[in-house]
Amino acid sequence: MKTFSDRWRQLDWDDIRLRINGKTAADVERALNASQLTRDDMMALLSPAASGYLEQLAQRAQRLTRQRFGNTVSFYVPLYLSNLCANDCTYCGFSMSNRIKRKTLDEADIARESAAIREMGFEHLLLVTGEHQAKVGMDYFRRHLPALREQFSSLQMEVQPLAETEYAELKQLGLDGVMVYQETYHEATYARHHLKGKKQDFFWRLETPDRLGRAGIDKIGLGALIGLSDNWRVDSYMVAEHLLWLQQHYWQSRYSVSFPRLRPSTGGIEPASIMDERQLVQTICAFRLLAPEIELSLSTRESPWFRDRVIPLAINNVSAFSKTQPGGYADNHPELEQFSPHDDRRPEAVAAALTAQGLQPVWKDWDSYLGRASQRL
């Protein structure tokens, strides 16, 4: 059974780096005028040569976004269920080597958090945990997903990679989507930053979206942690390769791409490569040209100023007022957080800023009486 690992083995990191850096202004202009991007076109739009074409790139990305999604921008919020973790990763506040207070929400905690989240108007929920299979694994998810499903119109997860059969079971319990970020597609760099635990297994993580596709999960989210490797352009191109593979092999699923940049955290590290805000805009817009139909997401890792200016260009999914620690909405304890969000505005403030620019915030885009895509056979 083929997976993206087979395609990944055909890709040479250094060759891709040289090809991206070798792209010319003519290559960029050809890509901007292409009706459908090739892999070479994507390299051109991620290249240094494309920096001089940012306005044209943004204009085309905005046109495609409006054509496909109108003026709508969906809102979601993360609910952190646990900061327990059995991995030791250099960049994460939840890393097992960090001496922080640990907490896992029980049924009563989840009810309080859910009430606080619903009071703010959110209907799209992203469930987040550290990676601790023994204490926050399938038994925990089986206990709590059904109650959460009754309260929210969309349930997605960002937890440890699971087996195909486990994803199929969670789908029946009401799970709609899974976000799984490879962190970096450079194997040696990956090994340097994942020191202990199951997350050391590069290929188990790399093949997770294949397992999601085979299990029929409705939405699959991809991304690289920008700044973890020494070349964000190559990592971003690898995300594009991963997306194209999945779209070809699991066309029934929908896809989402996120663009997380390293943020300060307990025991964190300095970025190995810096993507500035113009380069982040360049990357976001390149993905919109590559795949006009997918969801592009921007989290509260970015500043209010930046989000207010970039969301209208190509973003159609945003978080707001994110708390990155268990119990953060009902009882805020910052010492438990995974990383420090940059945009800490209330959701109504974010919505007002977008409405002022002619965009339509969407808090809910599905009703339970219509049935759930996650449960269709």
Predicted features by range, described:
Residues 78-80, 130-132, 158-162, 183-185, ...:
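Active-site beta-loop-alpha junctions enriched in small/polar residues
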Residues 53-74:
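Short, charged low-complexity linear segments at domain edges
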Residues 34, 61, 89, 180, ...:
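Conserved, mostly hydrophobic/aromatic
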Residues 1-50, 248-377:
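Auxiliary Fe-S-binding modules of radical SAM enzymes
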Residues 69-109:
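Canonical Radical SAM [4Fe-4S] cluster-binding loop centered on the CxxxCxxC motif
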Residues 73-77, 125, 155-159, 178-180, ...:
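Hydrophobic faces of well-ordered beta-strands that scaffold small-molecule active sites
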Residues 98-238, 243-245:
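Conserved Radical SAM active-site core
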